[in-house]
């Protein structure tokens, strides 16, 4: 005799606070993981990070990004390591406008420092990352002569000798390696077509590589914590126009201005986003990529967050946003095909390509009434005013099509709507077509607002 489970008698089991925290975290980062998969990130970091003992933590984080399907190009710097090599050789070098004049002794020191650093980085990736979340992961790192360089030459009477600039990046070979699931590692050295070696800057190599690859992100992990505003507060987001204006003002520190100049150059060359984040904060690259506000400064071509009408491309993001609220009964479950059918009714808030809020307007023109449905804001952005913005946007859409009233059906957010001008109504106040669809088992409250 077949056993029929008594599912109707099974009470839901509430998760522990730790379990709920984990579920909430995973739901919050899932849209980012989906959006960043198969995207190309060029990540530049200075030798100062290695000297500070942060290489192991960074490699662990990079391995995690790689495992999530992101294409990674790493560019390391080596200035403090070059200084150590010069000290061993009892050699002093000259800096002009922050650029080292690389004589023969300095070039040998740069080669030695870059070679040792490259081997240290490769060895760290090859250790199977013991005692980390990526323990046992097999990660291939490739290096090569991907960078063609040219001399800086003589500038204002100063011969920079073996100091160089990037002439060309072998983007095709790098892309081939990335497509084969390799991490590409570049050093701050380049070679001319005749085989002459040049000492380069990490920032120049990273910027030109990101431009050549049309990378989705250029990320500098540096001693600079980010870009500060005029009162010393971190600017989490900047448009490229604002970044250029900050450079024109001339009030930034020399190091900050240096990085920002390279960021602007990269974005003018086709890079979509750029980040400046501190290496002193353990896990800063993960926090920057997977937290809404990040921990450094992100620069984009336009303002990162904007409210717009939804398209079919947004259906997946809306589904991810509303699924948790459907699961706990806050929202009525919606089939994906119905979302696709009704997508023109939806408005969304997008931030860096991720959907963080949505709401829909269903008009009933005969009665001059509209229903606002599916008002949802991501948990990590609640309290920032996004719900208010969506409400005002839906009200504006309703007025634009001649509606006089707006109603919502809710079981849990009554007071939020009452504070914003809605009043209690009855099922009889609903348009006839909507009244026929009212769910008497759910018994949602009807709230109405005059527009």
Swiss-Prot record:
Pathway: Amino-acid biosynthesis; L-arginine biosynthesis; N(2)-acetyl-L-ornithine from L-glutamate: step 1/4. This is Amino-acid acetyltransferase. Belongs to the acetyltransferase family. ArgA subfamily. GO terms for biological process: L-arginine biosynthetic process. InterPro entries: AceGlu_kinase-like_sf, Acyl_CoA_acyltransferase, Asp/Glu/Uridylate_kinase, GNAT_dom, NAGS_kin, NH2A_AcTrfase. Residues 305-451 form the N-acetyltransferase domain. Its EC number is 2.3.1.1. One of its GO terms (cellular component) is cytoplasm. The keyword Amino-acid biosynthesis applies. It catalyses: L-glutamate + acetyl-CoA = N-acetyl-L-glutamate + CoA + H(+). SUPFAM superfamilies: Acyl-CoA N-acyltransferases (Nat), Carbamate kinase-like. Its main location: cytoplasm. It comes from Ralstonia nicotianae (strain ATCC BAA-1114 / GMI1000). Keywords: Acyltransferase, Amino-acid biosynthesis, Arginine biosynthesis, Cytoplasm, Transferase. In bacteria which possess the bifunctional enzyme ornithine acetyltransferase/N-acetylglutamate synthase (ArgJ), ArgA fulfills an anaplerotic role. The keyword Cytoplasm applies. It is found in: Cytoplasm. One of its GO terms (molecular function) is L-glutamate N-acetyltransferase activity. HAMAP family: N_acetyl_glu_synth (MF_01105). NCBIfam families: N-Ac-Glu-synth, PRK05279.1. It comes from the Bacteria. Coiled coil: none annotated.
